[in-house]
Amino acid sequence: MIYSPTEQFEIKPLLTVNNMLTLSVNNYVMYVALVVTLMYSSVFLLNRTYLGFNRWGVALLAVYDTILNMVKSQMGARGGMYFPFMFTLFTFMLVANLVSMMPYSFAMSAQLVAIVSFSLSLWFGCVLMGLSKHGWGFFALFVPGGTPLALVPVLVLIETLSYSSRAISLGLRLSANVLSGHLLMLILGTLMFNLMGSSMLGFMGGFMPVMGVIAIVVTEFAIGMMQAYVFTILLSSYIKDSVYLH
């Protein structure tokens, strides 16, 4: 990773089975399993009797309450049935972004194809939900109320393009932010490392940007948490559109 800024984003096969089909276990699958394991381990290791009486319990309750209030504010009282899914999704994204901050780790959220495919499946699920609840009335979402008849074709086209772009923008926003932040950290860290190894003067000068790199790392932690929340709140907004048609 010292010589290639993009090496940390490469998917590498760890175990390959060649038969009629090529099956492989790669580092992406390994990190997905790691994130899921960390998610469920944190729940099982937390003693419910002491929930709220230690820092870990207070933090978990704060996250739980934040996502619950977000879902209720987006979808009202009927949104409670979607809360378990939204909380699980937020926790998965949050843990994945935090794990990717480990040195020499693998940035799952920076895999554009995987994240966009995931967001596409979520968007398609919202469309199916709207069709199952409202039938053909779901397409009333693309015609705002009070629209003059002459403008209906144009607005339907615009609304269709806007609604369809959600499938890509949902994952693209997350992936682009994580990718850019990790690249910036790696490039500045590599520059500082090479500068300190060049000469004694370079070694002394290499300490100057340390505070800047630390600030970027702290900012990237905040961005990882914020992007997990943004991903969740946008998806809850899309679900609200499918349920209430507005």
Curated annotation (Swiss-Prot):
Disulphides: none
Transmembrane segments: 25-45, 51-71, 79-99, 112-132, 138-158, 178-198, 203-223
Any Pfam family: ATP-synt_A
GO cellular component: mitochondrial inner membrane; proton-transporting ATP synthase complex
Record keyword Transferase present: no
Gene Ontology terms, MF aspect: proton-transporting ATP synthase activity, rotational mechanism
Keyword list, A-Z: ATP synthesis, CF(0), Hydrogen ion transport, Ion transport, Membrane, Mitochondrion, Mitochondrion inner membrane, Transmembrane, Transmembrane helix, Transport
Residue numbers covered by the propeptide annotation in the UniProt entry: 1-3
Entries under InterPro entries matching the protein: ATP_synth_F0_asu, ATP_synth_F0_asu_AS, ATP_synth_F0_asu_bact/mt, F0_ATP_A_sf
Membrane topology: Multi-pass membrane protein
PROSITE patterns, per database record: ATPASE_A (PS00449)
Location in or out of the cell: Mitochondrion inner membrane
PANTHER family with a match to the protein in the record: ATP SYNTHASE SUBUNIT A (PTHR11410:SF0)
HAMAP family: ATP_synth_a_bact (MF_01393)
Subunit (UniProt): F-type ATPases have 2 components, CF(1) - the catalytic core - and CF(0) - the membrane proton channel. CF(1) has five subunits: alpha(3), beta(3), gamma(1), delta(1), epsilon(1). CF(0) has three main subunits: a, b and c.
Family (UniProt): Belongs to the ATPase A chain family.
Its job: Mitochondrial membrane ATP synthase (F(1)F(0) ATP synthase or Complex V) produces ATP from ADP in the presence of a proton gradient across the membrane which is generated by electron transport complexes of the respiratory chain. F-type ATPases consist of two structural domains, F(1) - containing the extramembraneous catalytic core and F(0) - containing the membrane proton channel, linked together by a central stalk and a peripheral stalk. During catalysis, ATP synthesis in the catalytic domain of F(1) is coupled via a rotary mechanism of the central stalk subunits to proton translocation.
The protein, known as: ATP synthase subunit a
Organism: Debaryomyces hansenii (strain ATCC 36239 / CBS 767 / BCRC 21394 / JCM 1990 / NBRC 0083 / IGC 2968)
Upper taxonomic lineage: Eukaryota, Fungi, Dikarya, Ascomycota, Saccharomycotina
This protein's encoding gene: ATP6
